[in-house]
């Protein structure tokens, strides 16, 4: 026990700092619109950040929002060399600003999830023999079998999704196996489409990377493995056993396992930095590269979620990040391997009717005023005297319902509510739906549960009070402007400290704490214990009577 305690202490950022001046870890984020980097010192302070914006800084690639939307409006790609050149640019900016690369102990990063990169046969040789005299993009120009990579916004693979679900026994069976039913943007379906439409490009690909493992490969000067967490967004990885599903691979394309390589735990050190960066920029030769992961898993690390915690991003869409011990895969949401604890899981749930719906009800029922909106929440009772509402002006995805549906305390549908009742019905309904669907994936509120709120509506204390009451847990607010980057730097420290043998929470305990915004009112748990089953039953009633729109 003593030895272990000592080993943990030796690996904490502070102990690392004592051994060497202002050492740091870098966190990278290869997102849809930009490449961003932060440097985090051993006290876990961010002391440097920079970015390259694709549309603005690399206009020659002709992207809008970092992407090309094709004529069919379904196919969406990004040029792989744009990502490579962005890395050249950002490292050049860091060098000219005097950034001291010699102090970098380790780096990790994040990539937009699901996107895929196809390395041409012979590319590994080019990667391993880079000349420090030239930028990357000049040396890697002929290394890719397709120049435009499918990304998460692509929805052109419906046929391949049907094929995959049919082959493994249906959508629920695929979800139990891989954590999600078949989604058009998921990598396995994109690979299947490439194999079917362009078998030559597929056969000329010696390695297929995710955006995350592609970026890590650039730093390694060799192919980086895919990590378990980002690998969970492919419809290919068995999330329980953490191996590729042979059944899924066989449906998608031949020889796929050798093109993907073996997946690794997300906190693995995958190697040391390529000599290219040592000679061109002055990185230390011992600088470690920790497996890159997806942007959502990296954000979970950046928000420092722990077991039982939940993060609620209240934006245009509302997104839930859950930490799960025992996942129950469903037809909705996504379950991934947890990026900071390989024994556990994380889940993502997306709700389309987010801030725009809140703003609409504010305009209709509170004369366009957030103050009046807040006043309505304060002047109405928890539980809204049994009045419940569903507000889906656009087709919701969790669950698939459209329209507004209001019910009184007797479960009778009514056509309208008074303004203040409408406002509380909206906010209570949005948060009850989140709790019900989270619990549907295996989430349970625990005594130590914290809720981390981010996004626009997290600035409204009265909305957060309802969130605390519905979940029966304290709500904290946290700044997440660079959470994927910062989370990647934290993950680099974690990998450096020993990865799986060390608790992530131990490594990041000195990071800035979130601030408490709301605690549940007395009696809240009794009120919502009665309302939640009613809300769930009414949701089922609406679902069963809803006419599915014609597709």
Curated annotation (Swiss-Prot):
Enzyme class, broadest EC rank: transferase
Catalyzed reactions per annotation: D-xylulose + ATP = D-xylulose 5-phosphate + ADP + H(+)
Cystine pairs: none
Residue numbers binding substrate: 114, 185, 295-296
GO MF entry, a single one: D-xylulokinase activity
Domain of life: Eukaryota
EC number(s) given by UniProt: 2.7.1.17
Binding residue positions for ATP: 370, 456-457, 460
Keywords: ATP-binding, Carbohydrate metabolism, Kinase, Nucleotide-binding, Transferase, Xylose metabolism
CDD domains: ASKHA_NBD_FGGY_SpXK-like
Pfam families per record: FGGY_C (PF02782), FGGY_N (PF00370)
GO biological process assignments: D-glucuronate catabolic process to D-xylulose 5-phosphate; D-xylose metabolic process; xylulose metabolic process
Similarity comment: family membership: Belongs to the FGGY kinase family.
Subunit details: Monomer.
Function statement: Phosphorylates D-xylulose to produce D-xylulose 5-phosphate, a molecule that may play an important role in the regulation of glucose metabolism and lipogenesis.
Protein name as it appears in the record: Xylulose kinase
Gene transcribed to yield this protein: Xylb
